[in-house]
């Protein structure tokens, strides 16, 4: 049973990395959505000085939609407030000097917005939600269902959106090249929806060093389309990660639980023998400095007995208040529940 720990501000120092590795963390995850080369080099150096052959996972951005990186404003959106979403190409040419009109540019092109029937948009793993109430050739007019702060890079979910042909982004190419050149041996791709998303990575790695033997590629299952296409996805992947942080806003809270266990049952019945990793919302209580809850422990127990082969800790270890304690508890639970 694997433990994957995401490295972030609260776990990037040598002391915490030593505790992680000493307490059975199998894989250290670097989130390339927030790529800081100097920091990543330091983490690799620290980790490999503790354990030379520690496995490192490079988690790529994939087709994740975000607030456009050239958005230079930060503002709060209140409950029941009207906002306007637009594409990155439109935002680059419009001139909005009206502070009373809140425009949120997304990292997609205008043709994607126009060809899709977008009804809902959510952000930050579903903690901010918007209902689309009107659409023209430039904007999606939406109303906020809760409050929160908007800034560049914030992750967005648009359930059922068709992003068109699968293409490896320039950002992912840069991340992949850096990962391979720094001897990272596990790649996980976000927002995989078809086998083409993984085959694109395999082809690109060949152009870097021509050798795929020592590199494992994991697919993150986190959209409705990925769930429908899981058979073709697992056929070309070395393992899958059921990424619940995005699966919940993509599928809905109630449906996402059904989808998780339907997928696990299908994999078990087909004698799937590769890694199945459960990610995010594992021990969220500890992320916020509290003790774990009985429901979290029951969930871990259920997953272990449903055939998963590991857990991926995200915010719990990257920004959580108890990163080492979280790893120690998960290790203890795995030992107890695997019997």
Language model segments and positions:
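Non-catalytic helical/linker scaffolds that mediate oligomerization, partner binding
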Residues: 1-339
């Amino acid at each position: 049973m694997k433990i994957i720990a995401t490295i972030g501000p609260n776990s990037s120092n040598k002391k915490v990395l030593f505790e992680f590795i000493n307490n059975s963390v199998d894989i250290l995850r670097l989130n390339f959505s927030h790529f800081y080369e100097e920091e990543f080099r330091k983490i690799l150096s620290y980790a490999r000085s503790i354990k030379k052959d520690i496995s490192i996972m490079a988690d790529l951005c994939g087709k994740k939609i975000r607030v456009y990186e050239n958005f230079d404003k930060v503002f709060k959106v209140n409950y029941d407030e009207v906002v306007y979403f637009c594409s990155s190409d439109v935002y680059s040419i419009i001139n909005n000097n009206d502070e009373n009109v809140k425009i949120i540019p997304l990292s997609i092109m205008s043709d994607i917005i126009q060809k899709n029937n977008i009804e809902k948009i959510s952000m930050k793993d579903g903690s901010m939600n918007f209902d689309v109430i009107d659409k023209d050739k430039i904007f999606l007019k939406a109303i906020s269902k809760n409050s929160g702060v908007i800034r560049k890079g914030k992750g967005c979910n648009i359930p059922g959106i068709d992003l068109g042909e699968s293409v490896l982004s320039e950002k992912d190419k840069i991340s992949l090249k850096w990962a391979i050149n720094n001897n990272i041996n596990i790649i996980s791709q976000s927002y995989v929806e078809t086998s083409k998303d993984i085959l694109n990575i395999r082809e690109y790695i060949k152009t870097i060093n021509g050798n795929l033997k020592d590199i494992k590629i994991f697919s993150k299952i986190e959209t409705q389309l990925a769930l429908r296409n899981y058979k073709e996805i697992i056929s070309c992947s070395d393992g899958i990660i059921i990424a619940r942080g995005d699966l919940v806003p993509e599928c809905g809270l109630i449906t996402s639980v059904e989808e998780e266990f339907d997928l696990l049952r299908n994999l078990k019945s087909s004698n799937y023998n590769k890694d199945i990793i459960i990610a995010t919302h594992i021990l969220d209580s500890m992320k916020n400095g509290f003790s774990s809850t009985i429901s979290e422990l029951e969930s871990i127990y259920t997953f272990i007995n449903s055939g998963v082969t590991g857990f991926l800790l995200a915010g719990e270890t990257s920004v959580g208040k108890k990163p080492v304690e979280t790893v120690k508890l998960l290790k203890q639970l795995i030992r107890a529940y695997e019997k």
